[in-house]
Amino acid sequence: MKKILKNDWEPILGPEFEKPYYQNLRQFLKEEYSMRVIYPNANDIFNALHYTSYEDTKVVILGQDPYHGPNQAHGLSFSVQPGVRVPPSLQNMYKELKADIGCEIPNHGYLVKWAEQGVLLLNTVLTVRQGEANSHKGKGWEQFTDRVIELLNEREKPVIFILWGRHAQAKKKRITNPNHYIIESVHPSPLSASRGFFGSKPFSKVNRFLSSIGEKEIDWQIPNL
């Protein structure tokens, strides 16, 4: 059978694709992609795992489900394709980045540079119908992405988990290994950012922790396109 994942996620996550829940999810997605507009493009569904391998993951930024507007989602949480307006939550992340560590605010929202440095930009649900937020909730993706979190939790080498908002914080119970570091606050959404996201300094906290364990810090500056 053709391998879905192209790096070190395949041997540890590959068995999920054979499980009944995933077979059901696959059938559901086949029908959805053939009958509706679904985001992201089917080839981009696993981009978070393709860009950031298991061993290279230093940080996890957990999102909910993909953006549901045209040309936005490309498989990385919070990130949008080049040429698309930066969504409000990401605008707030950029504002906090500037306040926290002085990063200039870029002219786009394409976060691949973070992913390539070991920031796993993972949504808990990996697909969505156009214009319908949470439309693929409860179809099996949660079980799959819970497994991703469990596999990272099993790792000896520390991982920093960034949990913004209640939805992400619900995953905290899966992070039981004391080696790991959890950063929590309200979500960067305009609805909640002023209640504790602004001023929470997550980006400098990440780099301080990485530095303390002898790991290379993340260069958070996204260059203009």
Swiss-Prot record:
Pfam families in alphabetical order: UDG
Keyword annotations: Cytoplasm, DNA damage, DNA repair, Hydrolase
CDD domains documented for this protein: UDG-F1-like
HAMAP family reported for this sequence: UDG
Family of this protein: Belongs to the uracil-DNA glycosylase (UDG) superfamily. UNG family.
Alphabetized NCBIfam families for the sequence: PRK05254.1-1, PRK05254.1-2, PRK05254.1-4, PRK05254.1-5, ung
Protein name: Uracil-DNA glycosylase
Species the sequence originates in: Bacillus cytotoxicus (strain DSM 22905 / CIP 110041 / 391-98 / NVH 391-98)
Name of the encoding gene: ung
